[in-house]
Amino acid sequence: MTEVSMSLTGHLKELRTRLLIILLSFFLAFFVGLFVSKPLILFLQKDDLPKEVILHVFKVTDAFQIYIEMAFIIGLILVFPVILYQLWAFVKPGLHASEQRITLRYIPITFLLFLCGVVFSYVITFPFILKFMFQFAAELGVETTIGLATYFQFLLQIVLSFGVLFELPMVIMLLTRLSLITPNGMRRARKYAYFCLLIIAAFIAPPEILSHLMITIPLIGLYEISIVVSGFTVRRMDKEMNMKKML
């Protein structure tokens, strides 16, 4: 067997081991989610909804479906740091010692950004959209009837989307380090980026202008923060390059 094929076999075994660890970790996290899901669903109903609004089930399977979906989402969130670490461990042999230290720091920051997106959308964006919709329905003299599945799927759509989108600064930092983008390039592409963010917000928000703005504005803020992050990364890379030249 050649050295290349042995190396390939070793990488495949390593990949299988990492995937197995992720899979087992997810099953454990999903098991935890089964215990947490029910009290979390009860809390979210009491915390978000006005007292006069009652959730309904329109299909026999709705309640159980949401229970399993919530447990699945909890499992994914809990296993997210494990996925990041296993990914880092897989590519670690191909990195220099300094790169290993830097990229390892990305793991807690990435997870923290995801949680910040979830918390931000749950505390600010989602309540605003919900309050506006209920008030608008009341002004029209319409009684609000919400399905359990529809409500929680909408909630998850908002908070998970924001969790993912809050990773933008980290993605920009990585792309900047790979010399794929620059802060000046991001500034020049600002109007195109804003247009793309408007389209992304349209997929997340209901078809209503205020709700759409409540999602678009934070996304634009994230883009501007990402430009700053990209600039900081470029300056740091230049500093590292100058230090290497001095050695």
Curated annotation (Swiss-Prot):
Q: A GO BP term, please?
A: protein transport by the Tat complex
Q: Which Pfam families match?
A: TatC
Q: GO molecular function: any one?
A: proton motive force dependent protein transmembrane transporter activity
Transmembrane stretches in the record are: 21-41, 71-91, 109-129, 154-174, 195-215
The protein's topology relative to the membrane is: Multi-pass membrane protein
Organism expressing this protein natively: Listeria innocua serovar 6a (strain ATCC BAA-680 / CLIP 11262)
Q: Name one GO cellular component term.
A: TAT protein transport complex
- Name of protein: Sec-independent protein translocase protein TatC
Q: What is its main location?
A: membrane
Q: What does this protein do?
A: Part of the twin-arginine translocation (Tat) system that transports large folded proteins containing a characteristic twin-arginine motif in their signal peptide across membranes.
Q: How does it associate, per the subunit comment? A: Forms a complex with TatA.
What is the annotated localization of this protein?
Answer: Cell membrane
User: What keywords appear on the UniProt entry?
Assistant: Cell membrane, Membrane, Protein transport, Translocation, Transmembrane, Transmembrane helix, Transport
Q: Which domain of life is it from?
A: Bacteria
The family this protein is said to belong to: Belongs to the TatC family.
Query: What InterPro entries has UniProt attached to this entry?
Result: Sec-indep_translocase_CS, TatC
